[in-house]
Amino acid sequence: MAVLWFDGLLARVADAGVYFLPEDDVDELLEAAAVNRFPCLRVNLAGCTGKADLLLRIAGVFAVPPHVVQDWDQLAPALERLRLADSAGQVLVLEHSEDLRAAALGEFKAAMEALQAVSADWAARDLAFWSFVVLDETQFDALG
């Protein structure tokens, strides 16, 4: 994909949500986020095997004390408090999710639903919250 494609996509608040992203497209996404002046945070999920660890890693990249986000329903309010006032959007990139998907697929799905809810909440205020789960191209078929 091209930076121009991502640039246009990120500007469309109504389309913001959770998406799977091929590894080869990460650099273009990061560049498009910079063009749009959207903060882009990356979460390395290598070795992550459950909800508590996942929430801890997300809290860590947002520099939120771990006790602030201990469940999915606490995620949206925490992220809203951290939103930069002059930014029309935010990009979250989740990388190396293989271990989590293998060990706790239900928690992975719950996380995606929570992030989708954050996107919907932000979109209601004309703000874009994008989440991208980076996958190797061969993993797309396994998602079903």
List the predicted regions and their residue ranges.
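Positively charged, polar, low-complexity stretches
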Residues: 2-144
